[in-house]
């Protein structure tokens, strides 16, 4: 038997040893039957393999790394603990409050009216009557007199302040706040305005705002009534402030934890993406090639030299059928050898190429175009490629993408050689390769 066929048979047997499921291939049923006829025992489960499984290559064994590439890489992130929403507790407060009064707003004075001396005197008389009614406990009557006084003299902050204090006695905090605001618009330093508004806000349970107004009133004109109200208001205001700070802190801590979880998740996702890319890169670099020069030229020389170089005198016309196969190792290698072949040397040779290219390298390439200019004698087909493989300068140049692109361009169209002659990186490589191909002169 031919030594080549024996070598191929040995490779096939080694493949079957490493992966017995190869015997399930329908086209090998005759071989399986032959083995069983000799008494061989086919491993259990081999016959039960799924018939739809794609036959595996006899040349390149599929590796587990290829399968891993299809698996989704999931970052290992700690499960986020779902935290309950923060629910604020009730604050136990002391002091009585009243329901807000929703009566229509009381009559206010017209600040655009010019106040005469007579109006001022009449306003003072109305104020005096209001004080008398107030001392007798006639609050509604006091409100009527003070409203008349405000109408006569709408520029008096005291009139608004007095009416606000009466509304407080009537437990009408909203009306009191309106009068207090009017008094403070006229006189921002009105102690009675701050005092009345602070007491009204305390009645509505607005403890923090009430404390602020009462402190301002006490600063302007301190009295015992303000101090007494503050003693009731301040404890509640402090409790509410502590309560607010507590839950502000809890919310801040919750937001910080969430931000930290998000940061860790993004970091884990980025790490997982990096690990996946690195694994794919390692897998692609370690995956064996189906042929080509060892150490190889990425992507090979695609398609070889289309149509071959024109036939010349001498050499073997049409190239050697079958050509030289790859020598294992270059990713992608010279696919199928250099397709198209380089039959019978270049007619006249390319510039700087002595005597043309060697006879066809490639898997049964197409014969070159007949005829052409007579060459100076074709080169023998059995060129020693070790001269290229053992040349460190050429092998280093092959790893340069720019050089490889130029070589591929020349291989596709030899006429493009001229445009690369001026490239200081490419021209020396092409010249050196021409010298290797030319052989002894």
From Swiss-Prot:
Residues 236-285 form a coiled coil. Keywords: Coiled coil, Phosphoprotein, Repeat, TPR repeat. Residues 41-114, 244-314 are annotated as: Disordered. Residues 61-71, 78-102 have a biased composition (Acidic residues). Residues 289-314 have a biased composition (Gly residues). One of its GO terms (molecular function) is protein dimerization activity. Residues 46-55, 244-282 have a biased composition (Basic and acidic residues). It comes from the Eukaryota. The modification Phosphoserine is found at residues 63, 89. Pfam families: HipN, STI1-HOP_DP, TPR_16. Residues 391-430 form the STI1 domain. TPR repeats lie at residues 121-156, 158-190, 191-224. One of its GO terms (cellular component) is histone deacetylase complex. Belongs to the FAM10 family. This is FAM10 family protein At4g22670.
């Amino acid at each position: 038997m031919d030594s080549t066929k024996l070598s191929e048979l040995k490779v096939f047997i080694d493949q079957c040893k490493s992966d017995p499921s190869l015997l399930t291939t329908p086209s090998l049923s005759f071989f399986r039957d032959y083995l069983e006829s000799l008494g061989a025992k086919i491993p259990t489960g081999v016959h039960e393999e799924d018939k739809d499984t794609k036959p595996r290559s006899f040349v390149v064994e599929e590796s587990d790394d290829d399968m891993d590439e299809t698996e989704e890489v999931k970052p290992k992130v700690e499960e986020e603990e779902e935290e309950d929403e923060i629910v604020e507790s009730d604050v136990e407060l002391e002091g009585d409050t009243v329901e807000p009064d929703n009566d229509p707003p009381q009559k206010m004075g017209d600040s655009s009216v010019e106040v005469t001396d007579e109006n001022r005197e009449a306003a003072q008389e109305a104020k005096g009557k209001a004080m008398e009614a107030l001392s007798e406990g006639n609050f509604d009557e006091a409100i009527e007199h003070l409203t008349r006084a405000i109408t006569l003299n709408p520029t008096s902050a005291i009139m608004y302040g007095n009416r606000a204090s009466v509304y407080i006695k009537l437990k009408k905090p909203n009306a009191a706040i309106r009068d207090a605001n009017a008094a403070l618009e006229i006189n921002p330093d009105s102690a009675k305005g701050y005092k009345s508004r602070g007491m009204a806000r305390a009645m509505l349970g607005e403890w923090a705002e009430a404390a602020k107004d009462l402190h301002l009133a006490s600063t302007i004109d301190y009295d015992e009534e303000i101090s007494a109200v503050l003693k009731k208001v301040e404890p509640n205001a402090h409790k509410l402030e502590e309560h607010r700070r507590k839950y502000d802190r809890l919310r801040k801590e919750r937001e910080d934890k969430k931000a930290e979880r998000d940061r860790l998740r993004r970091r884990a996702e980025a790490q997982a993406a990096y690990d996946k890319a690195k694994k794919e890169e390692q897998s692609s670099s370690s995956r064996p090639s189906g042929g080509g020069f060892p150490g190889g030229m990425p992507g090979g020389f695609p398609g070889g030299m289309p149509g071959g170089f024109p036939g010349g005198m001498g050499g073997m016309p049409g190239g050697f059928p079958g050509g030289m196969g790859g020598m294992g190792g270059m990713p992608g290698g010279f696919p199928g050898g250099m397709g198209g072949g380089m039959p019978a040397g270049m007619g006249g040779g390319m510039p700087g190429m002595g005597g043309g290219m060697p006879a066809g390298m490639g898997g049964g390439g197409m014969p070159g175009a007949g005829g052409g200019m007579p060459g100076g004698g074709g080169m023998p087909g059995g060129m020693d490629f070790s001269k290229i493989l053992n040349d460190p300068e050429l092998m280093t140049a092959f790893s340069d993408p720019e050089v490889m692109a130029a070589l591929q361009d020349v291989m596709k169209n030899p006429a493009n050689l001229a445009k690369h002659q001026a490239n200081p990186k490419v021209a020396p490589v092409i010249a050196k390769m021409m010298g290797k191909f030319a052989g002894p002169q």
